[in-house]
UniProtKB/Swiss-Prot annotation:
Belongs to the CBF/MAK21 family. A motif (Nuclear localization signal 2) lies at residues 408-415. It is found in: Nucleus; Nucleus, Nucleolus; Nucleus, Nucleoplasm. May be required for synthesis of 60S ribosomal subunits and the transport of pre-ribosomes from the nucleoplasm to the cytoplasm. Also required for initiation of DNA replication. A motif (Nuclear localization signal 3) lies at residues 806-813. This is Nucleolar complex-associated protein 3. Residues 1-22, 67-86, 112-169, 391-436, 802-830 are annotated as: Disordered. GO terms for biological process: DNA replication; ribosome biogenesis. Residues 118-129, 159-168 have a biased composition (Acidic residues). Residues 141-150, 817-830 have a biased composition (Basic residues). The gene is NOC3. Keywords: Coiled coil, DNA replication, Nucleus, Ribosome biogenesis. Pfam families: CBF (PF03914), NOC3p (PF07540). Component of nucleolar complexes. Interacts with RBL and NOC2 in both the nucleolus and nucleoplasm.
Length: 830
């Protein structure tokens, strides 16, 4: 108890002297003199902190009476500020408070509610507590109270937090569902709006032509599905409401003229339709460059060009379609190519004008991309149709001319007789002029050109087509070059090194009938150079240079040369010996997985089977080369080679001496007495001096058709006539025996027989074979396996010993180092 009492005793600080302002303080002369003399002693005065001294002095502990008086004064000031908002409490209910002066003070209450009163009391207490300076004990009590309140608050929190956590995901899910529902509703509303606008336009386009603007505004939506639906619906609307003629907007003079209401209505309809169609095309061209709308935009452009090729802005449509004719996207490329083919085959819709424009655009496209396009870009030319008898006059025109001449004679006779006929003549002239004007207007609307105009357009298209073909040939010759070593190796393009050469050669073979004979010589020289481009090049340079022509492309060049000669009825004086030499060398360079067998079979048919006049030495060389070729490759290649070999032997009777082994071929060899298998020229091979020994091997082929064909060829006699030619061509043989159509299954010689038949059919050698002792056989196998196991174990032990021997010196070195580190003497010696 004594200790507690001692702690409760508080020693008040001494009273401070009265505050005096610095201005009122007076200093004597002696004080100033003393300070000047002893400045060192007066320096501490400058370092005194008056604020800290005042704080320490003001931090004395207040008594209970002082606190009470201070609180009462503050409450009094608050009551005075509130004014008349308080009422006096009954003195019976509440005891008064007596101050030191002896005055009684009764309690008053405000007119507010109890909650407001509690809030004000708490606020007042907080203000008072903040203003008072607390002791350490009071601070501790306050901290303890705050901790207790915090603990109570923590106990109450978890339930509320769990409720909030449960409520938040539900709210988020509900918000997401609402958003999805709103998005679906907006999507359905927009779809219905598009359908309504489209139905209005289709039902009455003249009255509802303004709704096209609303449909075009829907194309600006952020939803891609809505934009696609709007584009497709606009496509259907434009296909239906576009007229069958080209719209011509009125000029300034025509606008100044007075017109009827119907004409105004049609003009307004046509102008709004043209504006909407133009803006629609602009949107399609913009969407075409975006990957999301690429296919939809190209589909709309292609369908519009097919449906309304006569309408306005067809040039813009054609440019957009030709631009994507070699697109890397296969769907877009097929759409554009099919549209161009449709335009070429249906010239009645546009009068042939779009064909000329399309061919020119394709030619410029090929030139701009340096002939590095997809083959489909040139294959569309195969759909063009050229009229051969376009310049010949019709019978009706001749009949009309004769009728006009007779009429002229009659009119001249009548003029001399009657003067009144002059008036009739003037009327007839006026009628003829009017008819000519009407026919001219009709031509301008229907786009039906005359024979001269049509012939002119077709000559322009033909010149553009052959211009592209010759450009491709020159480009391939430039890339290959006269010496391939001069050209640096470079990677081929996305579509190959020469993607346009194959369709170019096919087009030349088809359209050479329309080509002038003056250009035939240049064409044959180009083909000859291309066919012999890789013949003088070594294998190393062929592998390094990827721009050399393949075997299939060189065979195509030979084929086109023969087709050009056939189409012109052999009117050209061109030697085809070089092409035979290339075919003779290309037969051995052929590889089935790399090259096309169809082209090889076609070249064998056209160059060897269909050729009427052949040299005996050359025919024998091809017979020998084809027999060697049949041994090296599959069924389809060997069958087509045997069919060609048979036709050559049937046509050339002297070449059948190759089938006779007794003759030896020496007497029929001619100038060359020995066969040269590595000769590049068939005329210098000396094939008549050899024998077809390959047929004896082919007669034992696993395929029965090839073996039978080889036996029939080997059994041919020299006395057989040439009338019994084979009905099967090399192309048919290759197609029938290719892997795709071949259904051949080699027969299994093992027959399913009964046990009795097996015993009876066994030969005597099989019966005399002794039975095998399985026990001895198993012992031998076990010994063999044990030997192998021992060998593996020995190898493993050897490897372990070697590793252990390598580790021993390392361990010794480590031990020596450790000893030296432990002994300090050894360190000094080191």
């Amino acid at each position: 108890m004594g200790k507690n009492r001692r702690k409760q005793k508080v020693i008040p600080p001494p009273l401070l002297p009265p505050d005096v302002a610095e201005e009122d303080i007076e200093f004597s002369d002696e004080d100033l003199k003393y300070v000047k003399e002893n400045t060192d002693y007066a320096q501490f005065v400058s370092q005194i902190d008056t604020a800290a001294i005042n704080k320490q002095c003001g931090g004395r502990v207040m008594t209970v009476e002082d606190k009470y008086e201070e609180e009462r004064s503050k409450r009094k000031t608050l009551q005075e500020e509130k004014g008349n908002g308080e009422i006096l409490v009954d003195p019976v209910d509440v005891l008064p408070v007596k101050t030191l002066d002896g005055k009684l003070h009764y309690r008053t209450e405000s007119k507010k509610s109890k909650l407001a009163e509690a809030e004000t009391d708490e606020a007042e207490k907080d203000v008072l507590e903040d203003e008072h300076v607390l002791n350490k004990s009071q601070r501790r009590e306050k901290a303890k109270k705050s901790k207790r309140e915090a603990k109570k608050h923590e106990k109450d929190l978890p339930d509320e937090i769990l409720q909030e956590e449960e409520e938040t995901p539900q709210a988020a899910v509900l918000a997401e569902v609402k958003e999805e529902l709103s998005a679906e509703e907006s999507f359905e509303n927009k779809k219905n709006k598009i359908a309504e606008l489209g139905m209005l336009l289709l039902s009455d386009p003249e009255a509802n032509i303004k709704t096209l603007k609303d449909m075009l505004d829907i194309c600006k939506d952020q939803n891609t599905k809505i934009v696609k639906l709007a584009l497709l619906s606009l496509l259907a609307v434009f296909k239906d409401i576009i007229p069958g003629y080209r719209i011509r907007l009125p000029t300034e003079k025509e606008l100044e003229m007075k017109i009827s209401k119907e004409v105004k209505k049609t003009r307004f309809y046509e102008s709004t339709l043209l504006k909407a169609y133009k803006s629609y095309l602009q949107k399609l061209i913009i969407f075409e460059k975006q990957s999301v709308y690429n296919q939809i935009a190209n589909r709309c452009l292609c369908t519009l060009l097919e449906a309304v090729p006569h309408f306005n802005y067809r040039d813009n449509l054609l440019i957009a379609v030709v631009r994507n004719i070699s697109s890397p996207d296969e769907v877009v490329r097929r759409l554009c190519c099919s549209t161009i083919r449709y335009l070429f085959s249906n010239e009645g819709k546009h009068g042939g004008e779009l064909t000329v424009q399309a061919v020119r655009l394709i030619a410029d496209h090929v030139k701009a991309h340096n002939c590095q396009l997809h083959p489909n870009a040139i294959e569309v030319f195969m759909s063009i149709r050229f009229d051969e008898d376009i310049g010949k006059p019709n019978k009706e025109d001749e009949h009309n001319k004769k009728y006009k001449k007779n009429n002229k004679r009659k009119t001249q006779e009548e003029q001399n007789q009657v003067q009144e006929n002059e008036r009739k003549k003037s009327k007839k002239d006026m009628m003829s002029k009017i008819r000519d004007e009407v026919s001219a207007d009709h031509r301008g609307v229907t786009y039906e050109p005359d024979a001269k105009e049509r012939r002119k357009m077709q000559t322009e298209t033909l010149s553009a087509v052959f211009e592209t073909y010759f450009r491709i040939l020159r480009n391939t010759m430039y890339t290959i070059g006269e010496r391939t070593e001069e050209i640096p190796t470079s990677n081929p393009g996305a579509f190959g090194s020469h993607p346009l050469l194959a369709p170019c050669l096919d087009g030349l073979a088809k359209f050479t009938q329309q080509l002038d004979l003056d250009y035939m010589g240049d064409l044959m020289n180009y083909l000859k150079k291309l066919a012999s481009s890789s013949s003088s090049v070594s294998n190393n340079t062929k592998q390094k240079n990827s721009k050399l022509l393949t075997v299939s492309e060189r065979l195509r060049c030979c084929l086109v040369a023969f087709k050009v000669m056939r189409s012109n009825l052999n009117a050209l004086n061109v030697d085809l010996q070089d092409f035979f030499v290339q075919l003779y060398n290309l037969i051995l360079e052929y590889r089935p997985g790399r090259d096309s067998g169809v082209i090889l079979a076609e070249s064998l048919k056209i160059m060897l089977c269909d050729d009427r006049h052949q040299d005996m030495q050359k025919a024998a060389a091809f017979v020998k080369r084809l027999a060697t070729f049949a041994l090296c490759f599959g069924c389809a290649e060997s069958m087509s080679a045997l069919v060609t070999l048979k036709t050559l032997l049937q046509k050339n009777v002297k070449c059948r001496n190759l089938l006779e082994n007794d003759a030896g071929g020496g007497s029929v060899s001619g100038s060359i007495a020995k066969y040269q298998p590595y000769a590049t020229d068939p005329n210098l091979s000396g094939a008549l001096a050899t024998v077809l020994w390959e047929l004896s091997l082919l007669s034992k082929h696993y395929h029965p058709a090839i073996s039978t064909m080889a036996t029939t060829v080997s059994n041919m006699n020299t006395s057989q006539s040439q009338t019994f030619l084979s009905a099967v061509t090399p192309q048919q043989a290759f197609a029938d025996f290719s892997l795709v159509k071949e259904s051949f299954e080699p027969k299994n010689e093992s027959r399913k027989l009964n046990n009795k038949r097996k015993r009876e059919s066994l030969p005597e050698e099989a019966k005399n074979v002794p039975e095998i002792d399985m026990v001895k056989l198993s012992k031998k196998l076990k010994e063999n396996f044990t030997i192998l196991r021992d060998i593996k174990e020995d190898e493993r032990v050897r490897m372990e010993l070697l590793q252990s021997e390598e580790k021993k010196p390392l361990k010794k070195q480590n031990n020596v180092v450790k000893k030296k580190l432990k002994n300090p003497k050894s360190k000094k010696q080191i």
